[in-house]
Amino acid sequence: MSPAPTTSAGPASSGIPPSSLPTSTVTEDDTKPSSSSSKANDLLPRYLTNDPSRTGYDPSIQWWMNYFKILTGQITPEGVEHYREDRYKANEARDCARCEADRDWLFQNSPVIRFLREKVANLNGVLDETNVVCRRCPSRIVVIPGNKEKGEEDRIEVARQGGGFSPDHGILLCANEMRNRGHLEDTLAHEMVHAWDHLRWKVDWFGEKSLRHAACTEIRASMLSGECRWTRESIVRGNWTLTQQFQNCVRMRAIQSVMARPTCKDDVHATKVVNEVWDSCFSDKRPFEEIYR
């Protein structure tokens, strides 16, 4: 099928204090503008590389030695992220093989995955092992510049994702981020809702005309995939709220996804767009009749 990329997980706060980030250790993206545009450069995200003298994580020694250093508090939160990323690289083949086995099992045995696959096929789309692929998805420690005129400090986030959908390529499952088969099922269902929406309505993924398309499909995907059900929110994320928990989760995840669009200005803009389409999109359960998960 011809399933603009979306992601099912946005940046996550790492808890790394900005004061521990000397500018000499920060690298900028290779696609940055020329140095003459210094004002524009200040607005670009910067990505941190590991410095053992700062983080305590030394990739030249055995992994178990670094693990012991983590347990004894000798490695900073930033160093833990670098350690995790290196372990993902080392275990890439194992993680992808497990992801592919779980994907194939879900295609055969999961009621929600089989139902969505059938509905995609009814719209002349095909989702199978050729365009639902498992890959390692690198995470990056991002330095978000603060507004110096307002006295804001730089903010540190870890940018990672669980999966994605592209109309030109299909569905991506981030093998290194999948905790278990149930997590993969939620992620795959989320992206399959995007695929159905694209075949049904030709979604404006990048928000070139309007961000409302992106907001609506993100609301629907989070609502119908099961990723916001109470058991996952409470046990996995530690959110034990009983009232409006489901709605709050769907709204929050939709806002995070809309913020990743290039035409979205900030969280205020994303929230405004999500609120504009909330009533109509949250009540639209197609291709299901009810919310089953």
From Swiss-Prot:
Pfam families given for it?
Peptidase_M76
* Positions that bind a divalent metal cation: H190, H194
Active-site residue numbers: E191
Q: A GO CC term? A: mitochondrial inner membrane
Chain residue ranges for the region called Disordered: 1-51
**One of the record's GO molecular function terms:** metalloendopeptidase activity
Q: Where in the cell is it found?
A: Mitochondrion inner membrane
Enumerate the UniProt keywords alphabetically: Hydrolase, Membrane, Metal-binding, Metalloprotease, Mitochondrion, Mitochondrion inner membrane, Protease
GO annotation, biological process: mitochondrial protein processing; mitochondrial proton-transporting ATP synthase complex assembly
Q: What class of enzyme is it?
A: hydrolase
Which topology term describes how it sits in the membrane?
Peripheral membrane protein
Q: Where is the composition biased (Low complexity)?
A: 8-22
Q: What is its EC number?
A: 3.4.24.-
Q: Which family does it belong to?
A: Belongs to the peptidase M76 family.
Function, please?
A: Has a dual role in the assembly of mitochondrial ATPase. Acts as a protease that removes N-terminal residues of mitochondrial ATPase CF(0) subunit 6 at the intermembrane space side. Also involved in the correct assembly of the membrane-embedded ATPase CF(0) particle, probably mediating association of subunit 6 with the subunit 9 ring.
| Protein name per its UniProtKB record | Mitochondrial inner membrane protease atp23
Source species of the chain: Neurospora crassa (strain ATCC 24698 / 74-OR23-1A / CBS 708.71 / DSM 1257 / FGSC 987)
